[in-house]
Amino acid sequence: MRCLYLDVGYTCFINTQTSILNTINMKILILDNYDSFTYNLVHYVEDITGKLPDVYRNDEISVDEIKNYDAIILSPGPGIPDEAGILKETIKTYAGRIPIFGVCLGLQAITEVFGGEIENLNDVFHGVATEMKVIQNNTVTFKNIPETFEAARYHSWIASRNNFPEELEITAIDEDGSIMALRHKEFAIEAVQFHPESILTPDGKKMIQNFIAFAESQKPKA
């Protein structure tokens, strides 16, 4: 039995799905930024790998304790990155050492860590799906994803194009040209502003699968 947050509330069902990448043996951390969608990410990772990831809230684990993980997923969350416990310090510490995938607040934190800014929107997005456009095809996140796709949005902040960090690259935008996804040019860091774990993002699980498969490929060979 599992329960997912399906945009209109929690729905529980029996899981009979086998894992997609059942040969993967990884230690995956989901850093929970106190968001109701975090456990959708958890269940996606379980479906993909056949194993539950570790989940810690951003004030329940130390930065040092993260060092032995093979991949880090930064969950969505309320507020701004500076209010999210060890979120930004985790990115600073493990950038270039452990593959990182950020969702919503996670993208905003990555932007700030590398010297960028976030800006407050005049119109808040809450539980709506809008069209996204991939503008960089050779990314981990969007491998085998259509150039345009629908994705769920729950946010009032975005990464600003003003003073956008040279180290980062915009990989997807919305219809207004706002930043909807990015990656680091050198490190294994990618992030999305939308919610891949929402039922309103049909290709979302594939995006997370892409990240996990890539992170697994970066593990040192025994």
Regions found by a protein language model. Give the residues of each.
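C-terminal and late-domain segments of enzyme folds
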Residues: E169-I173, G177-A222
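Histidine-centered divalent metal-coordination motifs
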Residues: C104, H155, H195
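Cysteine-nucleophile active-site neighborhood
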Residues: Y69-T139, N144, E150, I208-N210
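Catalytic beta-strand/loop cores that center a nucleophilic Ser/Cys/Thr
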Residues: N138-E186
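N-terminal beta1-alpha1 cap of cysteine-dependent amidohydrolase-like domains
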Residues: G9-I14, S19-G96, L105, P202-A222
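Generic structural signal for residues in well-ordered beta-strands
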Residues: L52-V55, I118, I170
